[in-house]
Amino acid sequence: IIGVVGSLIVVYAVGYMYGYHKHRKDVRDNRRYFFMLLFIFLGAMFGFVLSESLMWIDFFWEVTSVCSFLLIGYTREAEAIRNSFRALWMNLLGGVALAVGIVYFDSAVNCVSLHKLIEYAQTGVVPAVIGVALIALAALTKAAQLPFSTWLMGAMVAPTPSSALLHSATMVKAGIYILFRLAPAMGGTTTGNVVVFVGGFTFFMASIMAISQSDGKKVLAFSTISNLGLMTACAGVGSHETV
């Protein structure tokens, strides 16, 4: 998704941003800055999915959060700035939960391996179970699950390539990715049940909101959130079949 869809979005953005600034004279033409953010964002996403160390996962997580903040606020308009800060604090809230989970697990077992975290959690080691719960909470914010989905709607004010990158391509998938990585440790647990409930509720509510919209971008956003909710619920079940 990152390499193929992300690359296609970047190629599309070349022509789109040319036309965008041709028609939006009120927005400062800073395309080099825009594309720099896109490439940093994609690089951070690659680092996120390829990392086994929880420390590196946390680092790349925060890089994507900062990039999304800057991309949403690209136009420097009042609405864009307001929505960019909303996205920032919601994603940083998840980042705090992720960091606390990692630090707590590391302080207890002296390990920052995601694989080891899952292994320990499956055997019922308390620090690992708590770590999984906190990281799952962080993933729910990144995956735009209710009630954390408002930042995703606010991303609509950004130029289409960045909103597409944030919506349908990569950033929200980071939360889904980490939930699926944690799925073996969540099956049949309280954390898993909470994730299933949040995902199912998001799927149902976002589906209703999607069919009631008349704006194409909002239909895309709510339908994306709905499908993310379905994937979240499947990850929470934790069985091989649902994954």
How would you label these PLM feature ranges?
Residues 1-243:
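...captures the hydrophobic TM-helix bundle architecture rather than a specific catalytic motif
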